Each structure stands twice: as structure tokens, then as C-alpha cells.
Amino acid sequence: MKIDIHSHILPKEWPDLKKRFGYXGWVELQHHSEGEAKMLKDGKVFRVVQERFVGLGTLPMQAPXSLFVHPWDMQYWFPWLIGMPAETTTAXESMMMGGVFEKVXFAHGGGSFPFTVGRIVILGTDYPFPLGELEPGK
């Protein structure tokens, strides 16, 4: 199964890639109304992209299937040491605040999210004062 998770944002003046590279199969967007575009492959419409799907991508919010988020890049092992926990936490918190959790599961036990949730300001920690004050409010 292939999952389409990119956001389908292309400028209106996108070049004709079939003409440029000499073969078909390129995806293009036809901006046909405010906040919507038709996604075309070889001139045939296969999906309408609505503005509300741009941030996360088209398929995850339209399809009945779930979305699994898993970061990957192995240079210096940073992803395993700090990247996966931090990036997974950032993704989890952004999606939680955006109300997008109906069909999503995160890798690595949610990264460091379970351990940092107490520091995330959602009417918690030092709210409404800046984090890290020795005596909050003074």
C-alpha cells in the first residue's frame, strides 16, 4: 500500500514536466476555485484537494485507513538519539492541538511525548507565567 502524505501545494505557474522531461506520469494541480484544486495525472482528474487538507496531506484525512508517522534519517544516529523522540513529540503535540487524532498512531511509544507532556503548556506547568521561573509570578 502506498500512502500519499505530502500536501499537494504547487504554484499556478508550474512548468509542463511532460514536455520538459519527455515522458508522462507527472502530477499537476488545476486551480479551479478558491481553496480547491483538482489533482491531475496525465490530464485525468484523480482527486480534488480541498484547502482543509493542505496542512496534513490529502489521503490521510479522506481515506478510512489510519496514518502511521515514523521519522527516518540515520546520519550520525541523531534521529535515534534525539530526533525521533523530539520530532515525534512535536508532531504529536501539533496534531493534538489541531484536533487531528481520530486516525493516527505514532512510532516509538509516542517518542518523548509521554515524558514531556507535563512541560507542555496546556493550562499546566507554570501557566500563565513563563516556564522556568523559580517562583512563578514574581
Curated annotation (Swiss-Prot):
Keywords carried by this UniProt record: Decarboxylase, Lyase, Metal-binding, Zinc
Q: What class of enzyme is it?
A: lyase
- Residues that coordinate or bind Zn(2+): H6, H8, H70, D126
- List GO terms (cellular component aspect): cytosol
Residues engaged in binding substrate: R47
Q: Which reaction does it catalyse?
A: 2-amino-3-carboxymuconate 6-semialdehyde + H(+) = 2-aminomuconate 6-semialdehyde + CO2
Q: What is its EC number?
A: 4.1.1.45
Tell me which domain of life the UniProt entry assigns to the organism this sequence originates from: Eukaryota
Give the pathway. Secondary metabolite metabolism; quinolate metabolism
The GO annotation for biological process reads: negative regulation of quinolinate biosynthetic process
GO molecular function per UniProt = aminocarboxymuconate-semialdehyde decarboxylase activity; metal ion binding
**SUPFAM superfamilies from the UniProt entry:** Metallo-dependent hydrolases (SSF51556)
Under the subunit heading, UniProt states: Monomer.
Q: What does this protein do?
A: Converts alpha-amino-beta-carboxymuconate-epsilon-semialdehyde (ACMS) to alpha-aminomuconate semialdehyde (AMS). ACMS can be converted non-enzymatically to quinolate (QA), a key precursor of NAD, and a potent endogenous excitotoxin of neuronal cells which is implicated in the pathogenesis of various neurodegenerative disorders. In the presence of ACMSD, ACMS is converted to AMS, a benign catabolite. ACMSD ultimately controls the metabolic fate of tryptophan catabolism along the kynurenine pathway.
What family is this?
Answer: Belongs to the metallo-dependent hydrolases superfamily. ACMSD family.
Name of the protein in question: 2-amino-3-carboxymuconate-6-semialdehyde decarboxylase
**Protein source organism:** Sus scrofa (Pig)
